[in-house]
Regions:
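Sec/Tat signal peptide C-region and signal peptidase I cleavage site
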Residues: 13-22
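Short N-proximal segments of mature Sec-exported proteins
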Residues: 24-95
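C-terminal partner/receptor-binding element of secreted or periplasmic proteins
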Residues: 108-130
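Acidic, glycine-rich flexible loop segments
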Residues: 84, 92, 97-109, 124
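Sec-dependent N-terminal signal peptides
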Residues: 3-13
């Protein structure tokens, strides 16, 4: 009997460990970036509603992650640098939309690291001349 209990417990524990997702995968950030994309496009519920609070709370994760990326962008390798045209400034809203579009258009990459995908999306949107 102890054998069966131990066997079942190990299977259940193993399944739970395997079911946990990578906290840095793009799949984890995807709902947050969708919410952020909706906010920057003006698609949001009434300002005083619980839905608006939930949307903002969820979007804050994506806004924060992209802001963090841009704060360290100057340390990136040249192939990951972001180079907007000289006379323009890229806004956080534009960056959110670029990253969200990448996540929407390449669902097969959502299991990959969010930060790598976001950096690649930004470098693709605003490439540097070689």
């Amino acid at each position: 009997m102890k054998y069966w209990i131990g066997l079942i417990a190990s299977v259940v524990i193993g399944a739970q460990v395997q079911a946990q997702s990578d906290p840095y995968s793009a799949a984890v950030f995807y709902p947050s970036c969708l919410a952020a994309g909706n906010i920057v496009q003006g698609k949001h519920p009434a300002a005083d509603s619980p839905e608006a609070t939930n949307q903002l709370r969820q979007a804050a994760i994506c806004f924060g992650a992209i802001t963090a990326i841009m704060n360290v962008e100057s340390y990136f390798k040249p192939e990951f640098a972001v180079c907007p045209p000289a006379d323009t400034k890229v806004t956080l809203a534009q960056m959110v939309l670029a990253v969200t579009a990448r996540l929407k258009n390449y669902p097969e990459q959502r299991q990959d690291n969010f930060y790598r995908l976001a950096v690649a999306a930004l470098a693709e949107a605003w490439p540097c001349s070689k």
